A protein has these predicted regions:
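Cysteine-centered motifs
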Residues: 7-11
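Ribosome-associated RNA-binding proteins
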Residues: 15, 23, 33-225
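Intrinsically disordered, glycine-rich low-complexity segments
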Residues: 28-30
Length: 225
């Protein structure tokens, strides 16, 4: 036990020395600069990512004019159409399902990408790459701002903050109204249950309850619905 504790202390001192040598001993505000790993080991304050619950409510007008905004983070959503897009646009899939939001909410671009990834992975394992068509209908136009502050032990000594601060750009979000479709999925009748499960998993990534609605194909699903 003593040997492990001595090794831990030695590693902590080594990392702290390395950070000091790389970034200098003091920062612009006079506080000591420490890397995130050293800060975690020594229990110091670090800049934490705020939870999505802080951004899910619709407040004020949308902040979207990117030509006047500098430094907007890149969008995490890589694809809005996945699967057999040609068959979907020509109407070859007899069953169409939609995932709709139950509340007015803001959905961050990271949540939209996570929902797309999990739903696409679920349906592709069963239907194959050409047996479905998935589409994300919402685009994260709204730019999120955050007043950066240090959090953790001793943070109140160095970061008092300012009331009603404008903040810096930290991400983007889509403003979704109640009943608005977020994701749609087109499949063949034999993959209906898997498609519902894929949209259910996608809804778990959003900060609001969602409803899966069958838009087309009731006549092909006798005994399943």
């Amino acid at each position: 036990m003593n040997g492990a504790h001595e090794c831990f202390c030695r590693c902590s001192r080594y990392l702290l020395t390395l950070i000091r040598a790389t970034f200098g001993r003091s920062g612009r505000g006079g506080g000591m600069i420490r890397g995130p790993l050293v800060a975690g080991l020594l229990g110091e304050f670090i800049m934490a990512r705020k939870p999505a619950s802080m951004y899910r409510r619709l407040k004020g007008p949308a902040y979207t004019r990117r030509k006047f905004i500098g430094g907007v983070p890149n969008n995490r959503i890589h694809q809005y159409h996945v699967g057999n897009r040609v068959a979907a646009e020509t109407g070859k899939f007899p069953v169409i399902l939609e995932l709709r939001a139950d509340n007015n909410v803001q959905i961050r671009h990271t949540a939209l990408e996570a929902a797309r990834v999990i739903s696409n992975s679920t349906i592709r394992k069963v239907a194959g790459t050409q047996g479905y068509a998935l589409r994300v209908h919402t685009f994260p136009h709204h730019v999120l701002r955050e007043n950066k502050q240090a959090t953790g032990a001793g943070a109140d000594r160095v970061s008092q903050g300012m009331r009603c601060a404008f903040g810096k750009n930290v991400g983007t979000a889509a403003r979704v109204k109640r009943g608005q479709r977020v994701i749609s999925l087109q499949v063949h009748p034999e993959y209906y249950l898997t498609a519902r499960d894929a949209l259910r998993k996608a809804s778990m990534k959003f900060p609001t309850p969602c409803t899966v609605r069958l838009i087309k194909g009731h006549e092909h699903l006798k005994g399943l619905i």
